[in-house]
Amino acid sequence: MEVILLSKIKKLGDSGAVINVKSGYARNFLIPKGKAILANKKNIESFEAQRIALEKEKINELLIAQSRAEKLKKINSITILSKVGKEGKIFGSVGVRNIIKEIILLGIKINKKEIRLPNGLLRQVGEHIVVFQPHSKVSINFIVKIIAKN
């Protein structure tokens, strides 16, 4: 029985794929759970129209993410002041929230999920590399400088 997948399913295919599965699997699992629809002419045509709209939306999201990444790339680095104890250790740590606060002050809106700290929380004075990933295909590194506050 041919069905159109509505969502990505492991070992079967991606969303929008027309696949052939056993009729019992389609009737008892895929279709009732909303993971697939029957692949007749009407459904294929309507899904093609939806797929084209989704692809345009994905391309638009990618372009927006690239423009946001370019804005942050122009800034290249941000500076955060923090109280420091002996040996250059910070009281507490600098996390994603602190970094987002500084970036928002520069006029770029970002989400907490878009910042990655490769080495965990920042606990030392100095320069640290942080990853900004607004989209799965767009990722840039920028520098966070932590300076001692007197």
From Swiss-Prot:
Gene Ontology cellular-component annotations: ribonucleoprotein complex; ribosome
Biological process terms in GO annotation: translation
UniProt-listed Pfam families: Ribosomal_L9_C, Ribosomal_L9_N
Domain of life: Bacteria
This protein's UniProt keywords: Ribonucleoprotein, Ribosomal protein, RNA-binding, rRNA-binding
GO terms, molecular function: rRNA binding; structural constituent of ribosome
Family membership noted in the UniProt record: Belongs to the bacterial ribosomal protein bL9 family.
Cited function: Binds to the 23S rRNA.
NCBIfam families: L9
Protein name, as recorded: Large ribosomal subunit protein bL9
